[in-house]
């Protein structure tokens, strides 16, 4: 898959303004991502999601995140995530490798 350290840098630059990853981390503009892998869309406890997120009904994993992170608004029309996405597949793979580790510690 990707490079965890490169993924961490991508997370800090592009994601950390709106998301946290640590267990017990607070929700910001976006939800805390701890426990993301294997969870259905729109299920982080204590965060208010759009109906689009709640109704998407997919399980987060490497493949679903790879597609989602390329263009979030295309993958889940109606999401309130304003991030435009990451076009480079390698950067998405690095970010996913980091998220897989960081959201499970």
Curated annotation (Swiss-Prot):
Q: Where does this protein reside within or beyond the cell? A: Mitochondrion intermembrane space
Please give the residue positions where the record annotates the modification Phosphotyrosine.
49, 98
Q: Which domain of life is it from?
A: Eukaryota
N6-succinyllysine is carried by which residues?
56, 73
Cellular component GO terms, alphabetical: cytosol; mitochondrial intermembrane space
Q: Which UniProt keywords apply?
A: Acetylation, Apoptosis, Electron transport, Heme, Iron, Metal-binding, Mitochondrion, Phosphoprotein, Respiratory chain, Transport
Gene Ontology molecular function: electron transfer activity; heme binding; metal ion binding
Q: Which residues carry this modification: N-acetylglycine?
A: 2
Binding-site residues for heme c, renumbered to this chain:
15, 18-19, 81
Recount the PTM note: Binds 1 heme c group covalently per subunit. Phosphorylation at Tyr-49 and Tyr-98 both reduce by half the turnover in the reaction with cytochrome c oxidase, down-regulating mitochondrial respiration.
Keyword check for Phosphoprotein, yes or no.
Answer: yes
GO biological-process terms attached to the record? apoptotic process
* Sequence similarity: Belongs to the cytochrome c family.
Record-given protein name:
Cytochrome c
State the organism's lineage. Answer: Eukaryota, Metazoa, Chordata, Craniata, Vertebrata
Write the gene name.
CYCS
């Amino acid at each position: 898959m990707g490079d965890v350290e490169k993924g961490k840098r991508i997370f800090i630059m592009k994601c950390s303004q709106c998301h946290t990853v640590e267990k017990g981390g607070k929700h910001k503009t976006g939800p805390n991502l701890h426990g993301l892998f294997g969870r259905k869309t729109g299920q982080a406890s204590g965060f208010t999601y759009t109906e689009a997120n709640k109704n998407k009904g997919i399980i987060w994993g490497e493949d679903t995140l790879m597609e989602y992170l390329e263009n979030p608004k295309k993958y889940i029309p109606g999401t309130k995530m304003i991030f435009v996405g990451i076009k480079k597949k390698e950067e998405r793979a690095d970010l996913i490798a980091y998220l897989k580790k960081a959201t499970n510690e």
